[in-house]
Amino acid sequence: MAAAAPGNGRASAPRLLLLFLVPLLWAPAAVRAGPDEDLSHRNKEPPAPAQQLQPQPVAVQGPEPARVEKIFTPAAPVHTNKEDPATQTNLGFIHAFVAAISVIIVSELGDKTFFIAAIMAMRYNRLTVLAGAMLALGLMTCLSVLFGYATTVIPRVYTYYVSTVLFAIFGIRMLREGLKMSPDEGQEELEEVQAELKKKDEEFQRTKLLNGPGDVETGTSITVPQKKWLHFISPIFVQALTLTFLAEWGDRSQLTTIVLAAREDPYGVAVGGTVGHCLCTGLAVIGGRMIAQKISVRTVTIIGGIVFLAFAFSALFISPDSGF
């Protein structure tokens, strides 16, 4: 028993060593595994913010150009800016046309040129009288528009307000004249024009007698085309042209056309003025005496003064740079 005890003690010693060594060997492995797992976990956590931060610059840089495009694309209304001048031009033309035609109508109805065309149309060929009067009025309108357009070298602000003052002066004068007129003012104007035309006819007949006999007595022959040409360029045509041009020169309608061309679209003023003269002269040629008896020159003059004052008053609400 005593001999076997040492053998058993020797045999149990290695077992005890193994029992002690295995935990010792396992402990470092566990210790190594634990920190490695913790470190791996810790290493995995920090990259997560890094991975989240790395795409952020890309995400920020990516949407920024899109945002810039969204901001700048609607802020460049190229088409609207191109269309605005054309729209303003059309409105300016219409405004000038309406202003010119309305002012010419209220200025020319019952005027001296109106009665000249009316009386000559009752005595001579209407088409010849209308052609001569319209040529004179067309030339006068074009000259007046050129005079008014020449003032555009002056800044528009000055011409705009000067023309406004002139409109107010014309309106006040027309109102005063209309209120002071007698109801028979149109008949007096008509008789005055008749006397003037009678005087012109007497001078024409006297000149014709002084020039000698006609073509038949001299033996000269005139072909048919020459007769047509002489019929168109007849003394009546020349008389209507000269009388209308001289009566219109310095008249209120000429001054009004100059003032309108200085502040409005010149093309609109030219077209509107020509159409207004054509309407008034056409009425005078077709039924001038009847119209002169039906309408009152006093009423037309008062209405004209109101129209002029309305244009002057509108300047208080329209900017000079608006194009109207």
Swiss-Prot record:
Region listing for Disordered, in residue ranges: 35-59
Database matches in InterPro entries: GDT1-like, GDT1-like_CS
Keyword vocabulary terms for this entry: Antiport, Coiled coil, Congenital disorder of glycosylation, Disease variant, Golgi apparatus, Membrane, Signal, Transmembrane, Transmembrane helix, Transport
Subcellular location: Golgi apparatus membrane
Main location: Golgi
Tissue expression summary: Ubiquitously expressed.
Lumenal membrane side: 34-89, 148-151, 250-267, 321-324
Superkingdom of the organism of origin: Eukaryota
Biased composition annotated in UniProt, kind: Low complexity: 50-59
PANTHER family, A to Z: TRANSMEMBRANE PROTEIN 165, TRANSMEMBRANE PROTEIN HTP-1 RELATED
Protein family (similarity comment): Belongs to the GDT1 family.
Name of this chain's protein: Putative divalent cation/proton antiporter TMEM165
